Curated annotation (Swiss-Prot):
InterPro entries assigned to the protein according to its UniProt record, in alphabetical order: MFS, MFS_dom, MFS_trans_sf, MFS_TsgA, MFS_TsgA-like
Protein name: Protein TsgA homolog
PANTHER family, A to Z: L-FUCOSE-PROTON SYMPORTER, PROTEIN TSGA
Family named by the database record: Belongs to the major facilitator superfamily. TsgA family.
Compartments where located: Cell membrane
Membrane-related topology note: Multi-pass membrane protein
Example of a GO cellular component annotation carried by this entry: plasma membrane
Amino acid sequence: MINKSNLIGLTCISFLSYALTGALITITGIFLENISKYFNIPITDMGNTFTFLNAGILSSIFISSWITNIINLKTQLIFGFILTIIATLILIFSHNLTYFSISMFMLGIISGITMSIGTYIITNLYTDQTRASMLLLTDSFFSMSGIIFPIITALIISNNMKWYWVYFIIGIIYLIIFLITINTKFPIIYTEISKKRIKTWNFSILCLSISALLYILGQLSFISWMPEYTMKYIHISINQSSKLVSAFWMAYMVGMWIFSFILKFFDLKKTIITLSGISLFLMSLFNIFYDYALLYIIILSLGFFSSAIYTIIITLASQQTPLSSPKTINYILTSGTVGTLLTFIITGPIVQKYGIFSALLVSNILYGIVFFLVIIFATLTKTKPIHD
């Protein structure tokens, strides 16, 4: 039986693991132009370079389970801290794009594995009654980083400090993880390998996986290019632009908390159609208005109403098989991560050819496709009732 202090320590590690990944992903759009000038390359090429971060996160999904069978969780976290120091030092002292790309890939793998450990800890330490709420609370730390770190990044850039100090500050998150890790006893967690195969890899799961991929791709494409768009075309400062990003993630976090309590009272299929439709409408509004105060209200609303879409997709996917399967959920999570990976691969060439606003239009189109996909899904499938 794990004692209370260890439980608190392990839970804090889980929270911080999501905060780490959130910090790395959500700051990109804020200093994209600044860092492209540092390396003297076009902004679209710089955006493509950040694909190495997303590729590292995607790679971590495939290697985390294998590593856990060889190296215990505590050792993984200690080793991750050492690699974080190395990657950060490379960013600070090397003025080389190749080394920058390697560091991004390293940070992607480190954060991805650390986040997998965080999820693994929560799902194994908490019972069915508290697991869902703890996972939701853990996931909200990703959004919390999306509120805090864009503001920190904007302050660093606006005060003429070098961009790499942002990564130094992000590294402090892993320092805290490291300090908690060395003072916490990790339980031996055994994994059960289910021999049952999922035979229902049907249209419904395929439809939901595509929806997850396109939703994350649309969301991150929008939030990555939106700061640059607003600074160039609406002529606002980097601080105002960062506040828009933070407002989105703040509303996203609040939305996750609120929807976690009210979703059980509504039909999930009708809810996801409603939320995706509202999100599509709000993003369309953002793309046609130029008033900062109005855009702030729109992006707050967009963050709130889109916050539950990904969670509902995962929940609906788990209901498409006779028994809720980790394999099904992992399939949806992988699809979402692929969406993350494709963010700059897809939008970079589009921005280079058609301009920054085209990235926002692509995001709008992707949200439109998700809206129609969930309508098709709801029309053609039946959903199991949710059992507490």
